[in-house]
Amino acid sequence: MKIIEGSKYAPGKKFAIVISRFNDFIGSSLLAGAIDELKRTGGVSDDDITVVYVPGAVELPLAAKRIAAKKQYDAIIALGVVIRGGTPHFDLVAGESNKGLAQVSLEYDIPVAFGVLTTESIEQAIERAGTKMGNKGGEAALGALEMVNVLDKI
């Protein structure tokens, strides 16, 4: 039996981080977590990390698609914060963002790590951006690091 696994060490690989500006007071912590994991765990240099800001989570898939089409990056990390309000807007934004990012990954054969928080409250978002529940931005970066190496081995 052959087992294929990827390490989380990927010096020389190039990563694009696409981040939504909406709810930036939380998103900035996700970004810091992602960059920290890429550099500390992945051995990725600053020169191999590009950060692209977009207005909101709905714009993440289009920016990711444009980045993927350029074929200059080994993985994309999508970050954002969508907090449920009193309208169905949350479900539309969260669902379309997730679906669009998955489509980019499959269409362009590139890992697109989903680090978009979809929470019921601001408190839950804060907990997942570096406090009680860890940093989901950092976790998305770890997933991107591992997938880059897994795909290299397949």
Swiss-Prot record:
GO BP terms, alphabetized: riboflavin biosynthetic process
Superkingdom, taxonomy of origin: Bacteria
Residues involved in 5-amino-6-(D-ribitylamino)uracil binding: F22, A57, V58, E59, V81, V82, I83, F114
Entries under InterPro entries matching the protein: LS, LS/RS, LS/RS_sf
Class of the enzyme per the UniProt entry, highest EC level: transferase
MF annotations from Gene Ontology: 6,7-dimethyl-8-ribityllumazine synthase activity
Catalytic activity: (2S)-2-hydroxy-3-oxobutyl phosphate + 5-amino-6-(D-ribitylamino)uracil = 6,7-dimethyl-8-(1-D-ribityl)lumazine + phosphate + 2 H2O + H(+)
Subunit structure: Forms an icosahedral capsid composed of 60 subunits, arranged as a dodecamer of pentamers.
Function: Catalyzes the formation of 6,7-dimethyl-8-ribityllumazine by condensation of 5-amino-6-(D-ribitylamino)uracil with 3,4-dihydroxy-2-butanone 4-phosphate. This is the penultimate step in the biosynthesis of riboflavin.
Designated name of the protein: 6,7-dimethyl-8-ribityllumazine synthase
